[in-house]
Amino acid sequence: MKRTAFFISDGTGITAETLGQSLLAQFESIPFNKFTRPYIDSPDKARVMVQQINAAAERDGVRPIIFDTIVNQDIREILATSNGFMIDIFSSFLSPLEQELIAHSSYSVGKSHSIGGNSNYMERIEAVNFALDNDDGARTHYYDKADLILVGVSRCGKTPTCLYMAMQFGIRAANYPLTEDDMERLQLPAVLKKHHSKLFGLTIDPDRLTAIRHERKPNSRYSSFAQCEFEVREVESLFRRENIPNINSTHFSVEEISAKILVEKGVERRFK
């Protein structure tokens, strides 16, 4: 039976959605209709939200799951009148923390994601700009400033991984696509040799690579299975010869790939 889940917040909804998604992912056999509702920051908005929750309960024949990070007690009480199963994230965790720390929390809306006074904000922006400026081997003269350089065949997941690490952790990651010419030379390009300690390889199953490339250039040599199989085989051989740590990206999310790379390379996150 499909269930409905709401991620409700009086701020951006990032915390409610992130934690809620992680919890729901543990129930792989149950399909969910998921809805994020940010900035529910007034009694009127809360009452409209109650109507949506109740409508979903009537439609589904079972009460929705509600993940909320509402700070205002009055708004929380209004939501509690709905026909939903409430998981109040702040109340669940803040009360035990207050007891352990012998201190009262500030109960501030959007505290962890605010820009003002947040030294991480500029780090994040600079890291994202670095990833974009050094994407796809377009520029290589700033590699000395990189924390990591991802290498692999075209369309194996290098760019989204670099951007995720930049956004989430402030990591300055460049990426370089290994071409057929590089494979025929049987060695790393000179620009990569100088930064061998920063290299991490991404590989991918040939059939998956074929499907991805077919969306970009259908019925071309570039997207043919034979070409994809050749490139993957040669790049994996290059990784072994050059002793470059690597991971197959086929069955991992960008979050999992990023975490594995940081652990393998011992790179510290600029912020957590």
Curated annotation (Swiss-Prot):
Pfam families: Kinase-PPPase
Highest rank taxon of the organism: Bacteria
Binding positions for ADP per the UniProt entry: G152, V153, S154, R155, C156, G157, K158, T159
EC assignment: 2.7.11.33, 2.7.4.28
Keywords: Kinase, Nucleotide-binding, Serine/threonine-protein kinase, Transferase
HAMAP family noted in UniProt: PSRP
Record-given protein name: Putative phosphoenolpyruvate synthase regulatory protein
Source organism of the structure: Pseudomonas putida (strain ATCC 47054 / DSM 6125 / CFBP 8728 / NCIMB 11950 / KT2440)
Lineage: Bacteria, Pseudomonadati, Pseudomonadota, Gammaproteobacteria, Pseudomonadales
